[in-house]
UniProtKB/Swiss-Prot annotation:
Pfam families hit by this protein: Globin
Function according to Swiss-Prot or TrEMBL: Involved in oxygen transport from the lung to the various peripheral tissues.
Organism: Coturnix japonica
Protein name per UniProt: Hemoglobin subunit alpha-A
MF (Gene Ontology): haptoglobin binding; heme binding; iron ion binding; organic acid binding; oxygen binding; oxygen carrier activity; peroxidase activity
């Protein structure tokens, strides 16, 4: 998915607003995903997936860091997330659909916290960005 100049501006703008809360939002998105799509818990058998657990917060921090890095290097998402793509494809073998589910949950969290900032245009740009991240993370699956 190709991000236009306007999309890139919108994504950078929304990430500037959420930057101070990225870890919190990452954990909220994971919590929402585990609640809404309980089948996603199968990839975390060693986690306490209860609301607010330290493990959800810790993994949410990793998710947020990856998204922030991708937004900061929006012109090279593939290069930025290459190692993470290798990890998910070759070692963790996460079902690719889960990236889409997590992206949807992240969008909801952003909408909850920044409803005025998530205009239809920004929503579309953020959705395209999250789809691009998901595509990169699944590119090395065979």
């Amino acid at each position: 998915m190709v991000l236009s100049a306007a999309d890139k501006t919108n994504v950078k703008g929304i990430f500037a607003k959420i930057a101070g809360h990225a870890e919190e939002y990452g954990a909220e998105a994971l919590d929402r995903m585990f609640t809404t799509y309980p089948q996603t818990k199968t990839y975390f058998p060693h986690f306490d997936v209860s609301h607010g657990s330290a493990q959800i917060k810790g993994h949410g921090k990793k998710v947020a860091a990856a998204l922030v890095e991708a937004a900061n290097h929006i012109d090279d998402i593939a290069g930025t997330l290459s190692k993470l793509s290798d990890l998910h494809a070759q070692k963790l073998r996460v079902d690719p659909v889960n990236f889409k589910l997590l992206g949807q949950c992240f969008l909801v969290v952003v909408a909850i916290h920044h409803p005025a900032a998530l205009t239809p245009e920004v929503h579309a740009s953020l959705d395209k960005f999250l789809c691009a991240v998901g595509t990169v993370l699944t590119a090395k699956y065979r």
